[in-house]
């Protein structure tokens, strides 16, 4: 299964954690996206790194086409201009 590695900055870790990390597991899992890890750098709490199992390369893009997912991402405080992702395969 491919892995998606994401790096981003968020406005506030606590808001991001509550809204995105803890609050959207069901929607991600319904899209076949399984969270492996989401956390922040030890000395930079607004610098976030994430790893997901994804069923195919475009899974996260398709998931973000969902209006509820888009709204949740915006409310979580992701700074989209800093978002970088790469799909890896083993």
Predicted feature residues:
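Short S/T/G/P-rich N-terminal loop/turn motif that feeds into the first structured element of a domain
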Residues: 1-90
